[in-house]
A protein has these predicted regions:
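Glycine/small-residue-rich phosphate/adenosyl-binding loop
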Residues: 27-31, 35-101
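A glycine-rich helix N-cap at a beta->alpha junction
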Residues: 66-73, 132-154
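Active-site helix/loop module of the DD-peptidase/beta-lactamase fold
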Residues: 119-136
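C-terminal helix-cap and adjacent tail motif
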Residues: 3-20, 25, 89, 142-173
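Short secondary-structure boundary segments
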Residues: 77, 121, 147
Length: 173
């Protein structure tokens, strides 16, 4: 798939088939996240692969938005390495970096004809407890992954995009 096709056809999948995701495809998705750019190349992303029944039972207690996907990535970032101090910049970039990583993985999944959705609705305290997430790790989001069900369709809001002149300005607002 070429890049234009990837970004134009991707949508948030909320209904998955039971077909498992092949390990080689998961590896490609994780590799896309590994090589994603991060501020100062600090690489604060930390990813838990949720793939077995026991882990999914825990996920189901943490969010209603698992959509019965056969695979799910729990994306965190390590706050102790999130700063880019190379040029005296003290701003924390962990959330931005982990978002870039998650987006790269999402686009690679689309390239592999897998569906995804970025989930921000979850109970962080339960996730932290159930998956032993250290205190210095911040939870960014969940990404269910799988083959879209035969009747999966984009939500009504998917195609509602602003015109470019509503969001892009040249040289000043």
């Amino acid at each position: 798939m070429d890049y234009d096709e990837i970004i134009k056809t991707r949508y948030s999948v909320r209904k998955y088939s039971e077909e498992p995701v092949e390990q080689d495809k998961l590896n490609k998705i994780l590799q896309a996240g590994r090589i994603a750019p991060t501020a100062g190349n600090r690489q604060p992303q930390r990813i838990i692969v949720i793939e077995n029944e026991e882990a999914f039972e825990k996920i189901k207690q943490c969010t209603p938005c698992h959509f019965n996907a056969p695979l799910l990535l729990l994306v965190c970032y390590d706050k102790s390495v999130e700063n880019n101090n190379h040029y005296g910049d003290k701003r924390p970039y962990g959330q931005v970096d982990a978002s870039i990583v998650l987006t790269h993985m999402m686009l690679e999944a689309q390239n592999l004809e897998l569906g995804t959705v970025w989930v921000g609705l979850f109970n962080p305290a339960l996730l932290r407890e159930y998956f032993h997430i250290p205190n210095n790790y911040e939870i960014l989001g969940l990404m269910p992954i799988g083959y879209p069900d035969m009747d999966a369709i984009p939500s009504k809001m998917h195609s509602e995009k602003f015109l470019i002149d509503h969001t892009v300005f040249y040289n000043s607002f």
